[in-house]
């Protein structure tokens, strides 16, 4: 549109006809809500990162005066601000909740969530109903973050602040490790649930809570029980009972104040965060030793969450019109509970009160279900008036620790043995706040505890001389002369390395746990064939190590990766390309005693599109599961594409099928997968009722050519993936394909090599 007259009154920008410009209007996702979310493979690029490309957070953290930061945090704890005054004159309870809710989003099934990237700063977490008032906690921290700049990330600072809060109130913590680098945008890969209302649970459970209207529902009290308790079969990978909660509803299931039923929710959700019963009791009781909840009045007084609040609030949300809107008038959860007589001092008073009184159901001023002690005196201090005392109160979920038989045994033991309680809480708190950091190799700082814990997936430190280039060459020759095929070598290496999850940094080739339970028995690894490969590689390892006289050794973990790399080189050579796959020795072999079988069970892939494997049917499509797997492997869309295409022609399908093996020369590293997938002479049609298998027939003659899965055809169907596939299908692409495949392959093999970084 052109304004020929130069009359500004006719300019569409100034007259409102072009008010909505870049990134506005109806989006692709509005038209096609089930469109494949390839976008999760291009998160956290340099385009969103304001720091220089050569910034190394680990190196920056090493220059931090951690003691000075902790000293400043100690001062902050009792430096009450008029704009958000501290309960009992101490911010400890608020900061413990901030750290807990930062870490507590972690879940074991996919390793996502957790404190590792400072996601509490971004939507949706910054606006969850369970995070009301944590906007204030982070703003209280801003002067300290501002002072130390990029030497400490928000992710580390939030957890450190929780530790200092505990220490400032007389508790000895287990330790602290830095190393959590910030990201600069929300993580779009996390599935938080399908509900479209806050506090909804109708999708994650059968007949669950409907939640509350979108423009309201900022506290759990808004979701009141209707007397029905739905099926408690929580959807995986979720670890929270309702949309916008961290774990459980403190009033009980869907607001039903039943401590026994609540215990079932607690056990399920805390278990999905990797906590056993003892750790769960310790965490709840330890956290509730401090501070209070806030429910001074109805949530009708509370305005919109941060992401929906006005510009003038500058990132604050939940503006409260009741009284002063702060201090004694604060509204957070809608509950009004202070658990102990000394809410700013570590004690055993939580358990003392829990068992000393009988409890009757009551309601907070906001209308939330809570419990009050019967026949008790007012012994609980007021947060802002030293002349006031209150009756002891508890949450429904607190009473679960007394009324659930298993929790009750642990709680009584902690009541009678305060030292055991303190030790259990210190360990559980450390696990809570460090669970998603991965191996100890990532831990930074002087406060890292020396004790090695099983949940850290320990791997022995290198205690021998590493192999050199000549050794690598000789070992490759032995591997290629062992009788093992290229596909066997590549498949074993992929099975070992592809367990890595970028979410919680677990899994990977280091440790060679592919030879141990449970991984050696996973269906996706084709146990019988895997055992053959490992047996021959172990023989090569034993012979090599026995032949050395200078202390040099090769670990099986290194040898598995080296074997895969040798297979890739041979496959490229057989296709006419002379290449070298880079290899860095230094992996070690973990023992069965260093491996938590149950915990590693969560790493078993329900689907691995790279091996054309899918274990069970689910509501999630095969292609969505492929994107999810690629995201966990930290792959970009081009890396996903070139890797899958290369692995197909290398013939490593889990079941040995020819699905997607679009080549007449399997075992050679060629771009045949892409050439044949995009061949217009092939016509595809579903050959299974579930549309998981497709036949590719000659368009002219009808003669069968190929069999494919959804994980194959998506590279011709999805417009973004097809655009990449076309690059690798081009006649000039062979060299690029081989080089890009090797680069992506090496990346996966080294995903857990934090020592190389």
Curated annotation (Swiss-Prot):
<dbReference type="GO" id="GO:0046872">
    <property type="term" value="F:metal ion binding"/>
</dbReference>
<dbReference type="GO" id="GO:0070301">
    <property type="term" value="P:cellular response to hydrogen peroxide"/>
</dbReference>
<keyword id="KW-0560">Oxidoreductase</keyword>
<feature type="active site" description="Proton acceptor">
    <location>
        <position position="101"/>
    </location>
</feature>
<keyword id="KW-0479">Metal-binding</keyword>
<feature type="cross-link" description="Tryptophyl-tyrosyl-methioninium (Tyr-Met) (with W-100)">
    <location>
        <begin position="247"/>
        <end position="273"/>
    </location>
</feature>
<dbReference type="GO" id="GO:0020037">
    <property type="term" value="F:heme binding"/>
</dbReference>
<feature type="binding site" description="axial binding residue">
    <location>
        <position position="288"/>
    </location>
    <ligand>
        <name>heme b</name>
    </ligand>
</feature>
<dbReference type="InterPro" id="IPR002016">
    <property type="entry name" value="Haem_peroxidase"/>
</dbReference>
<comment type="subunit">
    <text>Homodimer or homotetramer.</text>
</comment>
<feature type="cross-link" description="Tryptophyl-tyrosyl-methioninium (Trp-Tyr) (with M-273)">
    <location>
        <begin position="100"/>
        <end position="247"/>
    </location>
</feature>
<comment type="similarity">
    <text>Belongs to the peroxidase family. Peroxidase/catalase subfamily.</text>
</comment>
<dbReference type="InterPro" id="IPR019794">
    <property type="entry name" value="Peroxidases_AS"/>
</dbReference>
<dbReference type="InterPro" id="IPR010255">
    <property type="entry name" value="Haem_peroxidase_sf"/>
</dbReference>
<dbReference type="Pfam" id="PF00141">
    <property type="entry name" value="peroxidase"/>
</dbReference>
<keyword id="KW-0575">Peroxidase</keyword>
<feature type="site" description="Transition state stabilizer">
    <location>
        <position position="97"/>
    </location>
</feature>
<feature type="compositionally biased region" description="Polar residues">
    <location>
        <begin position="17"/>
        <end position="28"/>
    </location>
</feature>
<dbReference type="GO" id="GO:0004096">
    <property type="term" value="F:catalase activity"/>
</dbReference>
<dbReference type="InterPro" id="IPR000763">
    <property type="entry name" value="Catalase_peroxidase"/>
</dbReference>
<comment type="function">
    <text>Bifunctional enzyme with both catalase and broad-spectrum peroxidase activity.</text>
</comment>
<dbReference type="GO" id="GO:0005829">
    <property type="term" value="C:cytosol"/>
</dbReference>
<dbReference type="GO" id="GO:0042744">
    <property type="term" value="P:hydrogen peroxide catabolic process"/>
</dbReference>
<keyword id="KW-0349">Heme</keyword>
<keyword id="KW-0408">Iron</keyword>
<feature type="region of interest" description="Disordered">
    <location>
        <begin position="1"/>
        <end position="28"/>
    </location>
</feature>
<dbReference type="InterPro" id="IPR019793">
    <property type="entry name" value="Peroxidases_heam-ligand_BS"/>
</dbReference>
<keyword id="KW-0376">Hydrogen peroxide</keyword>
<protein>
    <recommendedName>
        <fullName>Catalase-peroxidase</fullName>
        <ecNumber>1.11.1.21</ecNumber>
    </recommendedName>
</protein>
């Amino acid at each position: 549109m052109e304004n020929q007259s130069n009359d500004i009154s006719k300019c569409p920008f100034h007259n409102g006809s072009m008010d909505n410009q870049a990134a506005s209007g109806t989006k692709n996702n509005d038209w096609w809500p089930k469109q494949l979310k390839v976008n999760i493979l291009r998160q956290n690029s340099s385009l969103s990162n304001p720091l220089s490309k050569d910034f190394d957070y680990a190196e920056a953290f090493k220059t931090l005066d951690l003691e000075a930061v902790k000293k400043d945090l100690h001062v902050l704890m009792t430096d009450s601000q008029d704009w958000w005054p501290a309960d009992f004159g101490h911010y400890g309870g608020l900061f413990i909740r901030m750290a807990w809710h930062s870490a507590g989003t972690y879940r074991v099934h996919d390793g996502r969530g957790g404190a590792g990237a400072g996601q509490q700063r971004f939507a949706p977490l910054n606006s969850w109903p369970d995070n009301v008032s944590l906007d204030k906690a982070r703003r209280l921290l801003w002067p300290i973050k501002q002072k130390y700049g990029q030497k400490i990330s928000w992710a580390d600072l939030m957890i450190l602040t929780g530790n200092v809060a505990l220490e400032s109130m007389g508790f000895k913590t287990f330790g602290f490790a830095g190393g959590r680098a910030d990201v600069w945008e929300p993580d779009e890969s996390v599935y938080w649930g399908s509900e479209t209302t806050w506090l909804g649970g109708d999708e994650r459970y059968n007949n669950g809570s409907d939640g509350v209207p979108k423009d309201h529902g900022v506290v759990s009290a808004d979701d009141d029980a209707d007397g029905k308790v739905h099926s408690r079969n929580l959807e995986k990978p979720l670890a929270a009972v309702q949309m916008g909660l961290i774990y459980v509803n403190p009033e009980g299931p869907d607001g039903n104040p039943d401590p026994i039923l609540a215990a079932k929710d607690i056990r399920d959700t805390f278990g999905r965060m990797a906590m056993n019963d003892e750790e769960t009791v310790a965490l709840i009781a330890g956290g509730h030793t401090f501070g209070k909840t806030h429910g001074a009045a109805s949530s009708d007084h509370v305005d919109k969450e941060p992401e929906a609040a006005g510009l003038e609030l500058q990132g604050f949300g939940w503006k409260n019109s009741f009284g002063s809107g702060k201090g004694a008038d604060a509204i957070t959860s809608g509950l009004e509970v202070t658990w102990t007589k000394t809410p700013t001092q570590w004690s055993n008073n939580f358990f003392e009160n829990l068992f000393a009184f009988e409890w009757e159901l009551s309601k907070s001023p906001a209308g939330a279900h809570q419990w009050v002690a019967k026949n008790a005196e007012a012994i609980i201090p007021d947060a802002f008036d030293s002349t006031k005392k209150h009756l002891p109160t508890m949450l429904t979920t607190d009473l679960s620790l007394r009324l659930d038989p298993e929790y009750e045994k642990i709680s009584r033991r902690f009541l009678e043995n305060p030292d055991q309680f303190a030790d259990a809480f210190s360990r559980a708190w450390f696990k809570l706040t460090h669970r998603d950091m991965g191996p100890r190799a990532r831990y930074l700082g002087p406060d890292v505890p020396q004790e090695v814990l099983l949940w850290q997936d320990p791997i022995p430190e290198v205690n021998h001389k590493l192999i050199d280039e000549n050794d690598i060459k000789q070992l490759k020759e032995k591997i290629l002369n062992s009788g093992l095929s290229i596909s066997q070598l590549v498949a074993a290496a992929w099975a070992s390395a592809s367990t890595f999850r970028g979410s919680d940094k677990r899994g990977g080739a280091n440790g060679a746990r592919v030879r141990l339970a449970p991984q050696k028995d996973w269906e996706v690894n084709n146990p019988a064939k895997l055992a053959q490969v490992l047996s021959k590689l172990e023989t090569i390892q034993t012979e090599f190590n026995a032949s050395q006289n200078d202390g040099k050794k090769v670990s099986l973990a290194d040898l598995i990766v080296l074997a895969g790399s040798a297979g890739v080189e041979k496959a490229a050579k057989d296709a006419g390309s002379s290449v070298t796959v880079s290899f860095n020795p230094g992996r070690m072999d973990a023992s069965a005693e260093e491996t938590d079988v149950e915990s590693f069970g969560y790493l078993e892939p329900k689907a691995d599109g790279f091996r054309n494997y899918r274990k069970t049917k689910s509501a999630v499509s095969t292609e969505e599961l492929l994107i999810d797997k690629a995201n966990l492997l930290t792959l970009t869309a081009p890396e996903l594409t070139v890797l899958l295409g290369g692995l197909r022609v290398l013939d490593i399908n889990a079941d040995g099928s020819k699905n997607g093996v679009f080549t007449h020369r399997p075992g050679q590293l060629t771009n045949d997968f892409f050439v044949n997938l995009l061949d217009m002479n092939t016509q595809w049609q579903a050959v299974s009722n579930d549309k998981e298998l497709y036949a590719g027939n000659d368009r002219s003659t009808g003669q069968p050519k190929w069999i494919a899965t959804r994980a194959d055809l998506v590279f011709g169907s999805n417009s973004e993936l097809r655009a990449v596939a076309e690059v690798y299908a081009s006649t000039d692409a062979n060299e690029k394909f081989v080089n890009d495949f090797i680069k992506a392959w090496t990346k996966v093999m080294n995903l857990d090599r934090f020592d190389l970084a």
